[in-house]
């Protein structure tokens, strides 16, 4: 789609509904926004009680005055639907809109995210509210994007959701016999004989039927996505030209975000890294890069960073201030990974309630002569000169598999490591190896296409769907390189174990081996991986937590275990499959092993780094492409300066100078331009 704006969106959550009795503050907001070069704000996210103070009584004039005044001053509006928190009158008149928690107790009114996505009454009230907003503002020239609800998520166990779950299961399985077979309910004599017997998994009920828990998580995602789709259809019924987004949280495991890819026009998320927690911020930079890549990969297009803090939060365990330079670094990192915006929560600090101490562009002092406002203004000035980058996007040659349903199944599997299988952490560790080398990666799930990639890294694909197994085999046979790992191809999509050789569904043939056993080590216990000659640069690597015992058929062993009763058996293999190669890492190593193995894979697959230079610790590079240009973001996460020799000349996008070496200040990001 066409970019919604010719500039990077710059602004944040604006809550004028909290200041309607202070017109002087609303007027001052406009002055300060101009001073900081704000061009866009998100309005109305939690304004429902002001928009509909009584049932059926809509008061939108104040909102129109706000949007008109913003537009008159060159500031555009991302207009939110206020379904993230409903007014108290609704909860008291219609208790069914409130969630029932996992103890099967209905919540009291209060908080936010305390509503049932299934409730027909809530859906109708949301639809009516959204339609009023769309009819009033759907053709307003200042409204450029719809912001659906806020940080969708959570579960409800009310009777309405239970019945909707049963209907969802009927649609999926058709018969109870099929459901019982898929869930293996003869175990413990839990066979269902009537649909009404099925209940959502709760601690006081059924929790060990793994297919039930897996399908419940799928259903929760389905209801949440369906709710968002209802909101999208409502606002677009008036003007389908205005795109929609909904803001996600970071790596929230309760909802499969990728199911939103066909609902929203633009993916977005809220970024709140724990800057300052470690001795340096390199690990935080790696983890944040992964989160950016997850959201960008949802649509494989530019995304929006809808929220971030310009200083501290107030809801994390410790509210550390961003050190000087970190604000610019964090904001430019978002752009580096494909964001077309830097948005804050919040524009102005409120005077009361739970986020009164959350960081904001304008604090309780209310002036522009603060460190935070100065840094925000500096970023605004910089963004105003980077229009050439807008709507460009990374085009990675490598992809890493992260699949929500696989994670749900693995975390509920009861073995082999009940103190934590570490699925997400393992995926992020593989991602970090590429990040440190300046190799861009997409994050894909099992529904994603694999066309266009040279390398697929698929860690711990415990739940292996048949269609993905087929795609992976075809990818490798056509010349692609694949890395698989331990605990792959164990169960099917209803969490039933594969019979016969595993990895199942043809992956035993792809990797040229079969798994026999898996050893789970206690914390503090280790094994060794001993590479064969010319395989990896070090003579040994430490292994921990999970060690799989495999038997090779056509695979060539590249390394073996160094201790325990399985010493000498294969720990790393490669198999030629069609025109490609399939590597298999049978044990969990530390980052050093993944880094060195990644170097081999990068060379084998012929991946192109974002920057033609050797990257030292704490420095990475990412690249965004237009048709004829490449914009390379070189990011220094170190608290000290350094100079980076370049293997070829680059143009500094912001100065126009040609560089053969690149000086970097601490926490600095510089943007280089190259011709494709």
Each language-model region and where it sits:
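An acidic-aromatic substrate-binding cleft motif
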Residues: 1-25, 30-40
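Polysaccharide-binding and catalytic clefts of secreted carbohydrate-active enzymes
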Residues: 91, 100-290
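Short, well-ordered coil/turn segments that N-cap beta-strands
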Residues: 6-10, 37-39, 71-77, 139-144, ...
